[in-house]
Amino acid sequence: VPHREDEIALVDTARAELLSLVTHELRTPLAVLSAYVELLSDAATGVSPAKPADLAAWREAAMQQVGRLNLQIDSILTAARPGSSLPLQPTPMNLGEITGAVIREMAPLLRNHSLRWEQPEPEIVVLADESRFRQVLGHLLENEAKYAPVGEPVSIGCWVRDGRAELYLTDDGSGIPREDWEEIFEAFVRRTQRPSTSGSGIGLYAARRLMGAMGGEIRIEPNGFGGSRFLLTLPLAPAVHGILAT
Protein backbone atom coordinates (compact mmCIF):
# COMPACT_ATOMS: atom_id res chain seq x y z
CA VAL A 1 0.00 0.00 0.00
CA PRO A 2 2.76 2.52 0.79
CA HIS A 3 4.30 1.80 -2.62
CA ARG A 4 0.95 2.48 -4.28
CA GLU A 5 0.59 5.71 -2.31
CA ASP A 6 4.05 6.80 -3.45
CA GLU A 7 3.10 6.16 -7.08
CA ILE A 8 -0.09 8.20 -6.69
CA ALA A 9 1.87 11.03 -5.08
CA LEU A 10 4.36 11.04 -7.97
CA VAL A 11 1.55 11.14 -10.52
CA ASP A 12 -0.15 13.99 -8.66
CA THR A 13 3.11 15.93 -8.48
CA ALA A 14 3.80 15.43 -12.19
CA ARG A 15 0.24 16.47 -13.09
CA ALA A 16 0.48 19.61 -10.93
CA GLU A 17 3.83 20.53 -12.51
CA LEU A 18 2.47 19.97 -16.01
CA LEU A 19 -0.58 22.13 -15.38
CA SER A 20 1.63 24.85 -13.88
CA LEU A 21 3.69 24.89 -17.08
CA VAL A 22 0.83 24.97 -19.55
CA THR A 23 -1.43 27.36 -17.63
CA HIS A 24 1.43 29.83 -17.25
CA GLU A 25 1.44 30.32 -21.01
CA LEU A 26 -1.91 32.11 -20.68
CA ARG A 27 -0.33 34.99 -18.76
CA THR A 28 1.65 36.60 -21.59
CA PRO A 29 -1.11 36.72 -24.25
CA LEU A 30 -3.48 38.07 -21.57
CA ALA A 31 -0.96 40.78 -20.69
CA VAL A 32 -0.52 41.71 -24.37
CA LEU A 33 -4.29 41.67 -24.95
CA SER A 34 -4.76 43.95 -21.94
CA ALA A 35 -2.17 46.37 -23.34
CA TYR A 36 -3.94 46.57 -26.72
CA VAL A 37 -7.31 47.11 -25.01
CA GLU A 38 -5.71 49.93 -23.01
CA LEU A 39 -4.45 51.55 -26.21
CA LEU A 40 -7.89 51.28 -27.81
CA SER A 41 -9.54 52.65 -24.67
CA ASP A 42 -7.17 55.64 -24.53
CA ALA A 43 -7.91 56.40 -28.18
CA ALA A 44 -11.68 56.06 -27.71
CA THR A 45 -11.74 58.41 -24.71
CA GLY A 46 -9.40 60.97 -26.29
CA VAL A 47 -6.61 60.40 -23.78
CA SER A 48 -4.27 59.42 -26.61
CA PRO A 49 -5.69 60.09 -30.11
CA ALA A 50 -4.71 57.56 -32.78
CA LYS A 51 -4.88 57.27 -36.56
CA PRO A 52 -7.55 54.97 -38.07
CA ALA A 53 -4.81 52.70 -39.43
CA ASP A 54 -3.36 52.31 -35.92
CA LEU A 55 -6.79 51.52 -34.47
CA ALA A 56 -7.35 48.83 -37.11
CA ALA A 57 -3.91 47.34 -36.45
CA TRP A 58 -4.50 47.26 -32.69
CA ARG A 59 -7.89 45.59 -33.09
CA GLU A 60 -6.36 42.96 -35.38
CA ALA A 61 -3.50 42.36 -32.96
CA ALA A 62 -5.94 41.99 -30.06
CA MET A 63 -7.96 39.42 -31.99
CA GLN A 64 -4.75 37.50 -32.76
CA GLN A 65 -4.10 37.25 -29.03
CA VAL A 66 -7.64 35.94 -28.51
CA GLY A 67 -6.89 33.27 -31.12
CA ARG A 68 -3.67 32.36 -29.30
CA LEU A 69 -5.57 32.01 -26.04
CA ASN A 70 -8.06 29.64 -27.66
CA LEU A 71 -5.23 27.47 -29.01
CA GLN A 72 -3.49 27.43 -25.66
CA ILE A 73 -6.66 26.47 -23.82
CA ASP A 74 -6.94 23.50 -26.19
CA SER A 75 -3.32 22.66 -25.30
CA ILE A 76 -4.14 22.75 -21.59
CA LEU A 77 -7.14 20.47 -22.05
CA THR A 78 -4.94 18.03 -23.97
CA ALA A 79 -2.27 18.11 -21.27
CA ALA A 80 -4.86 17.46 -18.55
CA ARG A 81 -5.89 14.11 -20.04
CA PRO A 82 -4.64 10.96 -18.26
CA GLY A 83 -1.29 9.75 -19.57
CA SER A 84 -0.62 12.98 -21.45
CA SER A 85 2.66 14.86 -21.56
CA LEU A 86 3.75 18.34 -22.53
CA PRO A 87 2.79 18.60 -26.23
CA LEU A 88 5.72 19.56 -28.47
CA GLN A 89 5.91 19.76 -32.26
CA PRO A 90 9.50 20.63 -33.27
CA THR A 91 9.73 21.84 -36.88
CA PRO A 92 12.24 23.94 -38.86
CA MET A 93 11.69 27.57 -37.78
CA ASN A 94 13.19 30.84 -39.01
CA LEU A 95 14.56 32.22 -35.75
CA GLY A 96 14.80 35.84 -36.89
CA GLU A 97 11.35 35.86 -38.47
CA ILE A 98 9.58 34.42 -35.41
CA THR A 99 11.56 36.58 -32.99
CA GLY A 100 10.57 39.68 -34.98
CA ALA A 101 6.92 38.61 -34.91
CA VAL A 102 6.99 38.15 -31.12
CA ILE A 103 8.65 41.56 -30.69
CA ARG A 104 5.88 43.21 -32.73
CA GLU A 105 3.20 41.42 -30.71
CA MET A 106 4.78 42.53 -27.44
CA ALA A 107 5.30 46.15 -28.55
CA PRO A 108 2.46 47.60 -26.39
CA LEU A 109 4.01 46.16 -23.23
CA LEU A 110 7.40 47.61 -24.16
CA ARG A 111 6.20 51.06 -25.22
CA ASN A 112 8.13 52.65 -22.31
CA HIS A 113 11.40 51.15 -23.56
CA SER A 114 13.56 51.53 -26.66
CA LEU A 115 13.80 48.13 -28.36
CA ARG A 116 16.91 47.25 -30.40
CA TRP A 117 16.52 44.14 -32.56
CA GLU A 118 19.67 43.00 -34.35
CA GLN A 119 18.09 40.77 -36.97
CA PRO A 120 20.43 38.00 -38.15
CA GLU A 121 21.97 37.87 -41.60
CA PRO A 122 21.85 35.36 -43.19
CA GLU A 123 18.73 33.62 -41.93
CA ILE A 124 19.05 31.17 -39.04
CA VAL A 125 16.79 28.11 -39.17
CA VAL A 126 16.38 26.14 -35.95
CA LEU A 127 14.49 23.02 -34.94
CA ALA A 128 11.92 24.07 -32.34
CA ASP A 129 8.27 24.13 -31.37
CA GLU A 130 7.18 27.59 -32.55
CA SER A 131 4.37 27.94 -30.01
CA ARG A 132 6.64 27.01 -27.09
CA PHE A 133 9.45 29.27 -28.31
CA ARG A 134 6.99 32.15 -28.57
CA GLN A 135 5.93 31.41 -25.00
CA VAL A 136 9.52 31.53 -23.72
CA LEU A 137 10.51 34.70 -25.58
CA GLY A 138 7.20 36.37 -24.73
CA HIS A 139 7.81 35.75 -21.04
CA LEU A 140 11.34 37.18 -21.23
CA LEU A 141 10.05 40.31 -22.97
CA GLU A 142 7.27 40.63 -20.39
CA ASN A 143 9.97 40.46 -17.70
CA GLU A 144 11.86 43.27 -19.44
CA ALA A 145 8.70 45.39 -19.46
CA LYS A 146 8.46 44.89 -15.69
CA TYR A 147 12.08 45.16 -14.59
CA ALA A 148 14.14 47.05 -17.20
CA PRO A 149 14.75 50.75 -16.42
CA VAL A 150 12.03 52.90 -18.02
CA GLY A 151 13.24 54.71 -21.12
CA GLU A 152 16.35 52.55 -21.43
CA PRO A 153 17.01 50.26 -24.42
CA VAL A 154 16.24 46.55 -24.45
CA SER A 155 18.49 44.67 -26.89
CA ILE A 156 17.89 41.36 -28.68
CA GLY A 157 20.19 39.64 -31.13
CA CYS A 158 21.09 36.18 -32.39
CA TRP A 159 23.86 34.34 -34.17
CA VAL A 160 25.26 30.84 -34.79
CA ARG A 161 28.12 29.63 -32.62
CA ASP A 162 29.62 26.15 -32.23
CA GLY A 163 26.92 24.62 -34.42
CA ARG A 164 23.98 26.00 -32.42
CA ALA A 165 21.78 29.07 -32.65
CA GLU A 166 22.06 31.56 -29.79
CA LEU A 167 19.68 34.41 -28.96
CA TYR A 168 20.40 36.98 -26.27
CA LEU A 169 18.21 39.51 -24.49
CA THR A 170 19.60 42.27 -22.27
CA ASP A 171 19.06 45.83 -21.06
CA ASP A 172 21.18 48.65 -19.61
CA GLY A 173 20.20 47.92 -16.02
CA SER A 174 22.42 46.55 -13.28
CA GLY A 175 21.39 42.99 -14.17
CA ILE A 176 20.66 39.98 -11.99
CA PRO A 177 23.16 39.29 -9.18
CA ARG A 178 25.46 36.42 -10.08
CA GLU A 179 24.51 34.48 -6.95
CA ASP A 180 20.90 34.36 -8.21
CA TRP A 181 21.65 33.09 -11.72
CA GLU A 182 20.62 29.51 -10.98
CA GLU A 183 18.10 30.01 -8.19
CA ILE A 184 15.98 32.28 -10.39
CA PHE A 185 15.11 29.30 -12.61
CA GLU A 186 13.59 27.40 -9.69
CA ALA A 187 9.80 27.27 -9.32
CA PHE A 188 8.10 30.13 -7.44
CA VAL A 189 11.23 32.29 -7.23
CA ARG A 190 10.63 35.93 -8.22
CA ARG A 191 13.11 38.63 -9.17
CA THR A 192 11.51 41.19 -6.85
CA GLN A 193 9.21 41.37 -3.89
CA ARG A 194 7.74 44.72 -4.92
CA PRO A 195 3.95 44.63 -4.33
CA SER A 196 3.37 46.53 -7.59
CA THR A 197 4.99 43.77 -9.65
CA SER A 198 2.74 40.79 -10.31
CA GLY A 199 3.90 37.27 -11.10
CA SER A 200 3.77 33.72 -9.87
CA GLY A 201 7.50 32.93 -9.99
CA ILE A 202 6.88 30.03 -12.39
CA GLY A 203 7.84 31.77 -15.64
CA LEU A 204 11.59 31.22 -15.78
CA TYR A 205 11.19 27.71 -14.40
CA ALA A 206 8.74 26.98 -17.22
CA ALA A 207 11.08 28.61 -19.75
CA ARG A 208 13.98 26.35 -18.74
CA ARG A 209 11.77 23.24 -18.88
CA LEU A 210 10.43 24.18 -22.32
CA MET A 211 13.85 25.01 -23.75
CA GLY A 212 15.22 21.72 -22.44
CA ALA A 213 12.32 19.78 -23.97
CA MET A 214 13.22 21.31 -27.35
CA GLY A 215 16.87 20.31 -27.03
CA GLY A 216 17.84 23.85 -26.11
CA GLU A 217 18.99 25.76 -23.07
CA ILE A 218 18.40 29.05 -21.25
CA ARG A 219 20.93 30.60 -18.91
CA ILE A 220 22.20 33.92 -17.60
CA GLU A 221 25.67 35.29 -18.35
CA PRO A 222 27.53 38.65 -18.16
CA ASN A 223 26.58 41.12 -20.91
CA GLY A 224 30.01 42.79 -20.99
CA PHE A 225 28.68 46.12 -19.67
CA GLY A 226 28.45 45.39 -15.97
CA GLY A 227 25.06 43.73 -16.18
CA SER A 228 23.70 40.36 -17.27
CA ARG A 229 21.77 38.90 -20.17
CA PHE A 230 19.56 35.91 -20.90
CA LEU A 231 21.01 33.53 -23.49
CA LEU A 232 18.85 30.98 -25.29
CA THR A 233 20.36 28.20 -27.41
CA LEU A 234 18.57 25.93 -29.89
CA PRO A 235 19.67 23.17 -32.27
CA LEU A 236 19.99 24.14 -35.91
CA ALA A 237 17.58 22.48 -38.31
CA PRO A 238 19.01 20.06 -40.89
CA ALA A 239 19.09 21.15 -44.54
CA VAL A 240 15.66 22.33 -45.67
CA HIS A 241 14.87 22.09 -49.39
CA GLY A 242 18.56 22.08 -50.17
CA ILE A 243 19.29 25.21 -48.10
CA LEU A 244 21.55 24.75 -45.09
CA ALA A 245 20.45 26.25 -41.78
CA THR A 246 23.85 27.86 -41.38
Could you tell me what each predicted segment is?
Residues 151-163:
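Short beta-strand/loop element within the Bergerat-fold HATPase_c
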Residues 144-145:
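Short helix-loop "hinge" at the ATP-lid/N-box region of the Bergerat-fold HATPase_c
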Residues 91-92, 116-124:
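Conserved catalytic submotifs in the C-terminal HATPase_c
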Residues 176-188:
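Short conserved segment of the HATPase_c
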Residues 61-69:
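Short alpha-helical segment of the dimerization/phosphotransfer core of two-component systems
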